Amino acid sequence: MSDILDMGGRVSLVTGAGQGVGAQIAKHLASASNSGGVAVNDYFIERAEAVADEINSAGGKAIAVQADVSDRASVEAMVTKTVEALGTVGVLVNNAGNAGAEPIPEQRKPFWETNKEIWDRTIGVNFYGVINCVGAVLPGMMKRQAPGRIISIISDASRYGDLGMEIYSGAKAGAAGFMRSVARTMGRHQITANNIVISLTNTPATQAWLEDPERMKGTMSKYIVRRPGEPSDIANMALYLASDASEWISGQTYPVNGGFTLAL
């Protein structure tokens, strides 16, 4: 990685990093210049361990940390473990997500035909998960008296909605608004907060969509860059926002979505 994207020795914590976008973000941050190491979180610890092992084998520094981000006590334990192993968290990437619905729109039930347990889980991971993680790292981040970075991965569904994704869309929109307020509050402490908005990306969760040629033909007509995103596309932006290069950027929402916004 170029030295212009220097991490300033900051320790990073990436949630939902056992595969897909989160895993690639963790790898990017670990391999960046002057990285302080990465805590790889996932609900499924074996996934986090596999990513951490890959980072360590490549010469980086990483640990695996299990947590359910919707549970405040679980998150606080995760942050404590990270601090003990690597040091105070200087970069938080909120990537953990739960769509709470089938990947194919036609297979999704109307939200009123689902149950409160599904609603609570979807809101818990996508909205309260961000609140829990930000709340757990901020006290230590402020005590560092050094630049800090908070980044949340948000979906285009938060801005434009999606068929059968009402609860998910609302939760992600709430998280985006929360981040903007965090940016206002934390600017005086040299801590920035930004959102990255993503659309259809090649991950294990989207394979049913990506493997349907007819569906993909219609979908790609809505993108200026006519291909699905790759995890590295999002990780590149996350690395920039986590690095010293972004110190005067805060409270912003960046679409990394192949021009989906303009094609609507």
Language-model segments: residues:
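Short C-terminal tail/terminal secondary-structure segment
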Residues: 2-4, 160, 239, 250-264
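Active-site helix of classical SDR
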Residues: 134, 171, 179
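Canonical Rossmann dinucleotide-binding motif of NAD(H)/NADP(H)-dependent dehydrogenases/reductases
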Residues: 3-39, 182
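Residue(s) in the substrate-gating loop at a strand-loop-helix junction
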Residues: 155
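Alpha-helical segment proximal to the catalytic Tyr-Lys
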Residues: 139, 184-185, 247
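Short, small/polar-rich loop/turn modules that mediate ligand/substrate recognition or access, typified
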Residues: 187, 192, 249-251
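Substrate-binding pocket helix/loop in short-chain dehydrogenase/reductase
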Residues: 103-120, 219
